[in-house]
Amino acid sequence: MKKILTSVFAFILAISLTACSTVNKNAEKKELKKVDFVLDWAINTNHTGLYVAKEKGYFAEEGIDLDIKPAPEDSTSDLIINNKAPFGIYYQDSMANKLSKGAGITAVAAIIEHNTSGIISLKKNNIKEPKDLQGKKYGTWNDPVELAMVKSLFQKQGGDANKLNLAPNTDTNSVTPLENGLFDAAWIYYAWDGKLAESMKLDINYFYLKDFNKDLDYYSPVIIANNDYLKENKEEAKKVLKAIKKGYVYAIEHPEEAAEILIKNAPELKDKKDFVVESQKYLSKQYATNKDHWGEFDANRWNAFYRWVNENKITKQPLADNTGFSNDYIK
């Protein structure tokens, strides 16, 4: 009888402990703070660290439930400026005009340490440097800062701005219209469109903007946050960025595994696995020279670009040094 009672007691205790464990786990889940994060474009390897951090539970460790939102039809920055979401992905160059108009946003982490963007063309067009764009069709997004940079590099080498022909570039990637002859050259980010061109076995030429003007080694892309949110939720913002940093550090250390996680969260990339892995291998080396300092801004480089913007009178109001970025939330 004693053995029976002991067994019954043990059974009841086990059930109670299981129930308590379930309640505790549910309580833990309920305690997670939901935070929205808006992407800038279709899911790509710029975003890998976010999905790694979510998959690996890094956000949950910080008490955060990050809800990654797809890119809007309009600018991601407008959603952040208007406090529709606290975080998003944007670019230092595109921030210039927003900041000059008093937009309440701050870049809080650099996804990639150096500017990997540049001009791609088919090798047959013989475009190896900015001056070679003369007489060619350049596919443009028609962004004022973009055009100012291209024209500046072109003219610096003696090019005639009147002989730079512009064509609209509205495709989701620049490689397909380039291959089809809609334009002769386009501005791309090498990790995605450059690697896409390689996967398509296209013979291309490519040059980095920063190689022709060091002031154009700006930060792109960056994580931006709403200023009011940062003031009211400083510790929460730090937790979000701590988890994101862990995600990108993992991607630096394990590019192939990180690519698998990205593909898992973006099934549309499944049939492009080899391309995605190659893109990730390239980008994992670009995220940061020193993984311990991922996300941190170099004030000199940030300011050098906005001084260039000021000198070229691209914005209505000049941008003061140290405008628009902070390392306070990533360190």
What are these regions (language model features)?
Residues 1-34, 330-331:
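Short, low-complexity disordered leader/linker segments with a strong preference
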Residues 26-170, 175-180, 184-191, 207, ...:
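Short, glycine-/small- and polar/acidic-enriched structural segments
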Residues 54-55, 60, 99, 155, ...:
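Short polybasic/polar patches that bind polyanions
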Residues 62, 107, 259-261, 317-319:
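Short, hydrophobic secondary-structure boundary micro-motifs
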Residues 93-94, 173-266:
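Pocket-lining segment of extracytoplasmic ligand-binding domains
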Residues 161-165, 268-279, 315-323:
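Short, surface-exposed acidic
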Residues 231-312:
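Secondary-structure end/capping motifs
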Residues 302-331:
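Conserved C-terminal helix/tail region of periplasmic/extracytoplasmic solute-binding proteins
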